[in-house]
């Protein structure tokens, strides 16, 4: 499963990669294997998936830009990668343990409950601080048709589609001796085609464009390496690069300019004196600037709206911080084992949930870096009236696979919310994406670039934006109903056999 995402992008394997685990767990339970071996199967599968998919985190080594020596840097990197791989492995172990308890149920009920359990676990994991590798993102950016199921009930519906097809394929193998292999494979194929046809129907829906909703946005990709970002030459390069980029885009007729996360590593109180804000006052074109917000003795990672008069009129604070990077989860337990990777000495804090970000062009949906992995951050802002997406990221810490996976996450958020998206990063990949997930333009990697594109403000409210993930509770309810009916039928059959 880990090969389905960048840099391998074998997305089609996702439709069969879970089936072997399903088969091994069910067949091993029937052979009375010890429970520990079944848990180990799930743990191994989970570590394999998340470990391969998130191998890009090893790109943080060497951390000489933080002054960390080579060997300690390697130790920290190995710990971080091992920790997130094991954390993902726990997901697989829990799911495998649940599957063992229904291994004696009928195939249709096993598929229903197995799919529901996976969706519930993804909901729980995504509600926590450490999340990235939903099964749904294995299909992005290549399988745009199936990703449109996200407009109905979010990424969990895409995940349910993948798990259910894998389950039917697995049950085909488990029931092959009963001569049911062909029947199950036909059902799996039919379901796969039907789901893609539904998604394709949504994918081909026309996108309304009008001059009244058009907004020409420019992005500046500063390409400031982390090694120099906070050094004098890095600060000078950032100030010059973003100011010159802003002026270049203004000359191209943009109405607003978006910069990456932490583009100017200054606090809000110092922003008005920067050359970039001075240029905004002079040219009268709005800028969205990534910088740091003040919050008492702490700070936030923020995006600011600077209006045509050079005034800061709105602020969005990053609410999902990077574990082991921007803060230490379970700090009381592991805080002494891992040094903080953030280059700043002050204590970074989470932004509040349910923020709104008003701009001179209407309300926007904002995601800063790691937040792209959390669909609810975007859905809630769309439900609150957000009309377009502004994604601001750094992505300079890791290997090239990470920013491409990050772009894939932003594509999913654009599809789910039915919004146009402008994405500005420090080193790549910056991009513009339409509501169908089509990339209109994408930058190079480790390059300085500016680009302008016209996006459109939208106020549509699809099922997912309006109701959130309603499918997972429905799936759980159907599973409970199926379980209850199965018990009733079994008891009824036993009673009838006694009467005879």
From Swiss-Prot:
Predominant subcellular localization, coarse grouping: membrane
One annotated GO biological process: lipoprotein biosynthetic process
Sequence intervals crossing the membrane: 5-25, 38-58, 74-94, 111-131, 145-165, 185-205, 469-489
Pathway where it operates: Protein modification; lipoprotein biosynthesis (N-acyl transfer)
SUPFAM superfamilies xref list: Carbon-nitrogen hydrolase
Keyword Transmembrane: yes
Compartments, record wording: Cell inner membrane
The keyword Magnesium is assigned to this record: no
Annotated family: Belongs to the CN hydrolase family. Apolipoprotein N-acyltransferase subfamily.
Function: Catalyzes the phospholipid dependent N-acylation of the N-terminal cysteine of apolipoprotein, the last step in lipoprotein maturation.
Protein name, per record: Apolipoprotein N-acyltransferase
Organism for this UniProt entry: Nostoc sp. (strain PCC 7120 / SAG 25.82 / UTEX 2576)
Upper lineage: Bacteria, Bacillati, Cyanobacteriota, Cyanophyceae, Nostocales
């Amino acid at each position: 499963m880990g090969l389905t995402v960048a840099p391998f992008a074998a997305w089609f394997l996702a439709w069969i990669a879970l089936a072997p685990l399903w088969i091994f767990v069910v067949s091993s339970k029937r052979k009375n294997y010890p429970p520990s071996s079944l848990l180990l199967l799930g743990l191994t599968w989970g570590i394999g998936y998340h470990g391969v998919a998130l191998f890009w985190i090893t790109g943080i080594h060497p951390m000489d830009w933080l002054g960390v020596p080579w060997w300690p840097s390697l130790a920290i990197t190995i710990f971080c990668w091992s920790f997130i791989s094991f954390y993902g492995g726990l997901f697989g172990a829990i799911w495998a343990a649940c599957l063992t308890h229904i291994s004696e149920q009928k195939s249709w009920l096993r598929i229903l409950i197995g799919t529901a359990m996976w969706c519930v676990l993804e909901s729980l994991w995504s509600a926590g601080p450490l999340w990235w590798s939903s099964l749904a993102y294995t299909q992005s950016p290549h399988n745009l048709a199936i990703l449109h199921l996200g407009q109905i009930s979010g990424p969990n519906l895409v995940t349910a589609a993948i798990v259910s097809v894998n389950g039917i394929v697995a049950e085909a193998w488990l029931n092959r001796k009963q001569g049911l292999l062909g029947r199950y494979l036909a059902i799996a194929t039919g379901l796969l085609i039907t789901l893609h046809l539904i998604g394709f129907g949504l994918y081909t829906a026309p996108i309304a464009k009008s001059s009244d909703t058009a907004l020409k946005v420019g992005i500046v990709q500063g390409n400031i390496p982390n090694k120099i970002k906070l050094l004098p030459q890095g600060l000078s390069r950032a100030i010059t690069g973003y100011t010159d980029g802003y002026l270049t885009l203004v000359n191209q007729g943009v109405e607003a300019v978006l910069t990456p996360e932490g583009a100017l590593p200054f606090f809000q109180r110092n922003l008005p004196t920067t050359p970039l804000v001075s240029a905004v006052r002079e040219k009268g074109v709005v800028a969205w600037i990534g910088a740091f917000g003040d919050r008492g003795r702490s700070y936030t990672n923020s995006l600011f709206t600077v209006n045509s008069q050079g005034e800061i009129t709105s602020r969005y604070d990053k609410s999902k911080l990077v574990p082991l990077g921007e803060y230490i989860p379970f700090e009381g337990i592991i805080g002494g084992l891992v040094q903080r990777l953030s280059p700043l000495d002050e204590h970074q804090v989470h932004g509040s949930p349910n923020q709104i970000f008003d701009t001179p062009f209407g309300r926007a949906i904002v995601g800063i870096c790691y937040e792209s992995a959390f669909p609810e951050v975007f859905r809630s802002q769309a439900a609150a009236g957000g009309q377009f997406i502004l994604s601001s990221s750094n992505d300079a810490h890791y290997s090239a696979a990470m920013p491409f996976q990050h772009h894939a996450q932003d594509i999913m958020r654009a599809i789910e919310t039915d919004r146009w998206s402008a994405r500005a990063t420090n080193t790549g990949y910056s991009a513009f994406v339409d509501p169908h997930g089509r990339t209109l333009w994408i930058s190079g990697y480790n390059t300085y670039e500016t680009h302008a594109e016209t996006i459109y403000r939208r106020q549509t409210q699809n099922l997912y934006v309006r109701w959130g993930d309603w499918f997972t509770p429905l799936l759980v309810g159907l599973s409970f109903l199926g379980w209850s009916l199965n018990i009733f039928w079994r008891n009824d059959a036993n009673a009838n056999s006694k009467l005879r």
